Amino acid sequence: MAKGKDVRVRVILECTSCARNGGNKESRGISRYITQKNRHNTPSRLELRKFCPYCYKHTTHGEIKK
């Protein structure tokens, strides 16, 4: 039996350039991705380069709090 909290947790990644600009006028919103991470292997915040459909380019997506 597993003890303690689950090792894999669900995290939300948000586009940092959209969030920084506050969803500027030409942007329709803020891009978000849902993924999982292993808490033991990556205890720090996760940052990945993903495609943002609102910026029309690959940008850094950072982990946000729920």
Curated annotation (Swiss-Prot):
GO terms for biological process: translation. Coiled coil: none annotated. GO terms for cellular component: chloroplast; ribonucleoprotein complex; ribosome. SUPFAM superfamilies: Zn-binding ribosomal proteins. It is found in: Plastid, Chloroplast. InterPro entries: Ribosomal_bL33, Ribosomal_bL33_CS, Ribosomal_bL33_sf, Ribosomal_zn-bd. GO terms for molecular function: structural constituent of ribosome. Belongs to the bacterial ribosomal protein bL33 family. This is Large ribosomal subunit protein bL33c. It comes from Ceratophyllum demersum. The lineage of its organism: Eukaryota, Viridiplantae, Streptophyta, Embryophyta, Tracheophyta. The gene is rpl33.
